[in-house]
């Protein structure tokens, strides 16, 4: 393939990601103020160890973090987002890699966006960094990427403190020479398959009670109505996937507000989630005869449901 164009406002939107690598974190410092304590921990957690030799960056192969490299796809997003919630403290590492292609040597001004601490390397050379993670707002740092004619490996080494709702988010925005740059991924052999799968998923659209595609679904396409299960016990139950290979449309069940479509091509796995807003309706607790519960009866029902969830998990 000839490479992708930059996304909205010059953002790079095609990456490979490894991680997160998570390990227990402990610090002897103490503070009665929770937010001040977390801010202190973020100020000291980043190690900024030199990346050194990255080796071949291939889908399915292990990175320097001993985590698999994956192609990252999140329809319409300008950022890599692998955020999650941590009930105990963790030291988090994740790596992001992309390739910028140009026909001549140019110095490009870029903006790095992240809540994490990030070291940015261009062809193995450290070009800039965000020194420590933050809770909010997102950080922005401008830096210069010295691009050579041909393929240039851009490598983001990210570190974060995992505590409560943790924003493991990063993005790279090109501010000049936008028309002179194409984007690819380090694993050239997977780039064509990624482009095919992504183009198929981007063509999908909701029409009434159907999900329609511009072309027949490729081999390895399936879908599920599972998206995000708030009940931890139910979340452990494997999702049910239905085959969609060769279909131009999928007839969707009523009462299912979310549908996730997955395409697997070789080692690549891309997913896109669709929300059916009209299917998001209140669920009322009613007696068998259809009458409503009183306030006190409804409150007891809520408490019993909470107790059941906790006992199951």
Predicted region positions:
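Extracellular beta-rich ligand/substrate-recognition surface
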Residues: 83-93, 131-136
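Short structured motifs
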Residues: 80-84, 95-97, 138-142, 199-201, ...
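Aromatic-lined ligand-binding clefts that engage carbohydrates, nucleic acids, or primary amines
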Residues: 102, 107-121, 154
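A glycine-anchored, Pro-Gly-centered beta-turn/N-cap motif
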Residues: 106, 148-150, 246, 253-257
